[in-house]
């Protein structure tokens, strides 16, 4: 590890995050995260503090991936064409709402974080937008689709996914949990490990991810790395 300052900084945060979780090697996990993010050769261990990368001159468009449609084009290509022809010079950034394959909630019940919904386009469309505009997107990290490969693996007792989701007992005292939903908080699921009750803050199609498992954190670090590589 070339940059011990970076390692120590990451380890400090990992210790705070996983203070109450037993059996975690803070140093090994920190090294894994640095490797996943490909930061091994970074010269400076600390980012410059309190640098605001946004100011009053920034103006952004927020859009679903299919808000702009043109016959014969993918929606994301049409979005780029609209930005270039209609608002370039007036705006310098675009926030695209979830553009992944999904099963419900307008894109917020994600099936596959590593893919672009093929009905919208592909990663080349995302990279094209990022070439000319500051690009922002949603990373839905609190839950994923109950039909995702991770949850299928949870049901079948396979990795990755077997221990990726928050579970609880129906005997737990949950009356203090307040949420604007009508469906029960817990969903009963038959799995290879027996009957389990998974935590569903939003809906039974959106199962909460368990970040007490460091493998979940590493999966999302890998996803973030992919997004950065794509603009």
Task: Describe the predicted segments one by one.
Residues 3-221, 225:
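Acidic/aromatic-lined carbohydrate-recognition and catalytic surfaces
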Residues 227-231:
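Active-site groove signature of glycoside hydrolases
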């Amino acid at each position: 590890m070339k940059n011990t300052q970076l390692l120590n900084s990451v380890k400090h945060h990992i210790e705070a995050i996983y203070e109450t979780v037993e059996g975690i090697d803070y140093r090994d996990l920190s090294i894994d995260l640095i490797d996943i993010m490909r930061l091994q050769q970074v010269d400076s261990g600390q980012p410059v503090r309190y640098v605001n990368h946004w100011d009053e001159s920034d103006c952004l468009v927020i859009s679903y991936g299919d808000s702009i449609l043109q016959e014969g084009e993918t929606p994301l290509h049409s979005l780029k064409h609209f930005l270039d022809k209609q608002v370039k010079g007036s705006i310098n950034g675009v926030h695209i709402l979830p553009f992944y394959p999904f099963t419900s909630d307008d894109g917020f019940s994600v099936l596959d974080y590593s893919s672009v919904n093929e009905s919208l386009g592909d990663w080349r469309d995302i990279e094209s937008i990022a070439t000319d505009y500051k690009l922002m997107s949603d990373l839905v990290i609190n839950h994923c689709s109950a039909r995702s490969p991770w949850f299928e693996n949870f049901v079948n007792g396979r990795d990755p996914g077997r221990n990726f989701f928050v579970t609880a007992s129906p005997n737990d005292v949950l009356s203090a949990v307040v949420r604007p939903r009508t469906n029960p908080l817990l969903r009963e699921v038959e799995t290879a490990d027996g009957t389990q009750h998974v935590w569903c803050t939003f809906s039974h199609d959106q199962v909460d991810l368990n970040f007490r498992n460091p493998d979940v954190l590493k999966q999302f670090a890998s996803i973030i790395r992919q997004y950065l590589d794509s603009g």
